[in-house]
Amino acid sequence: MMQSTKVTLLKACSLLFALCVLTNFANAQTTTGSLNDLSFLEGHWKGTYNGGPIEAGWTAPEGNNIMGYIRMIKDDKPALYEVFAFEPGEKGPIARVKHFKPGLIALEEKNVSDTYNFIEAKKNQALFEKDDVSVRIIYERRSQNQLVIQRGKMEDNKWVFMDLFVFTRVP
């Protein structure tokens, strides 16, 4: 009789465990995003980087894209241009970035761009990961007039982020 009770109890516990797992699985939501999750980027921004001024601008979401740029100046001359296109993907926006030296000389091949895939978004913040999984980027509007881009690298099996660009809104 005791053995039969143990078997029945074990079956009941197993069934309860399976129901809990299935319920949690059914309630799990895949994180997807939209271009509207990036609307906080919109505007004209300025900052300082590597001893010189930087300037950035992003459009509002329209026509299934957001366009942006960063212009870096060193010694009163252009040092680097970055052009961004955020476009919809299966799981959320995909960021494509091209880099240019002065004279619009591309650093990437003609048909190649750095591609960053959407991971998640919160209010005024979005996280992307580079295709080769070597870098993560956080876009974050910390206040109405401050926008920060952070770069993350894997260190000791965890992502460590540092501010890369800190911008102030241009009125």
Spell out what each predicted region is.
Residues 2-14:
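Bacterial N-terminal signal peptides that target proteins for export
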Residues 26-28:
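Boundary at the C-terminal end of the N-terminal hydrophobic targeting segment
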Residues 30-44, 88:
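N-terminal helix-cap/turn-to-beta initiation motif at the start of protein domains
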Residues 48-130:
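Central antiparallel beta-sheet cores of small beta-barrel/beta-sandwich binding domains
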Residues 54-56, 82, 135-137, 161-165:
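Short beta-strand segments
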Residues 128-129, 137-140:
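Exposed beta-sheet edge/beta-hairpin loop segments within beta-rich domains
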Residues 142, 146-148, 153-171:
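Edge beta-strand at a domain terminus
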